[in-house]
């Protein structure tokens, strides 16, 4: 059995493997939060969809000199928010892995940016931050005087035609997984992309791994936002 999905799917594959059914897992989740691999199928497509949607929102944000507060997916991981925020030039990015203070990380940052002459702003918020983006927009408007609007992108992020990167990586992982199964029914493995190479791990080992956010990338986002 080839199982495509995230942690929940892999736990199911583990249980099947324990019952003697050869299984190979392929990481497929837009959150990119599978610890054993650098890249999960679906992530790049979702990231590009977010970028396209935010670019459209930015058109009116710029023309009306507003602040747009945009919630993107990512319940436990901020990879989408962080990379999308960098790609669209967000003023502030809030992700669940890093503690934040609205006054310090949003309001003060906007005020500093205003002093440079900027009159439009994008705030990207991962859903896992548990921030009410509508209330945040009201707070921003009250404290900065900048007209603010909120948008929850929702399930539009989950659909769409896969990017070339997703298609190529899915093909490589699928090919690798089938070869593993054909090698004397070798199962109980998870396929992973590590530094552009396709490798595999024991499924129990993979489930026990923990993935952390790239703090250096977060610093880049902070440095280029003003």
Q: Which residue stretches match the model-derived regions?
A:
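C-terminal non-catalytic interaction/assembly regions of soluble proteins
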Residues: 132, 138-226
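Short beta-strand elements at the ligand-binding edges of bilobed clamshell
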Residues: 36-47, 161-167
């Amino acid at each position: 059995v080839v199982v495509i999905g995230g942690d929940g799917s892999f736990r199911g594959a583990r249980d099947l493997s324990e019952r003697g059914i050869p299984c190979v897992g392929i990481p497929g989740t837009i959150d990119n939060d599978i610890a054993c691999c650098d890249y999960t199928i679906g992530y790049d497509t979702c990231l590009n969809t977010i970028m396209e949607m935010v670019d459209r929102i930015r058109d009116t944000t710029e023309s009306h000199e507003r602040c747009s507060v945009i919630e993107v997916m990512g319940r436990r991981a901020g990879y989408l928010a962080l990379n999308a925020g960098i790609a669209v030039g967000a003023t502030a990015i809030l992700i669940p892995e890093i503690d934040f203070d609205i006054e310090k990380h949003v309001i003060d940052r906007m005020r500093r940016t205003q002093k440079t002459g900027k009159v439009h702003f994008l705030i990207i918020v991962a859903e896992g931050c548990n921030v009410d983006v509508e209330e945040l927009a009201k707070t921003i408007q009250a404290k900065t005087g900048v007209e603010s609007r909120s948008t929850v992108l929702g399930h539009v992020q989950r659909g769409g035609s896969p990017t070339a990167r997703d298609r190529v990586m899915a093909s490589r992982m699928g090919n690798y997984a089938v070869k593993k199964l054909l090698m004397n029914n070798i199962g109980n493995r998870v396929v992973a992309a590590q530094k552009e190479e396709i490798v595999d791990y024991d499924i129990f080992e993979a489930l026990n791994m923990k993935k952390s956010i790239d703090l250096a990338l977060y610093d880049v986002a902070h440095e280029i936002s003003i």
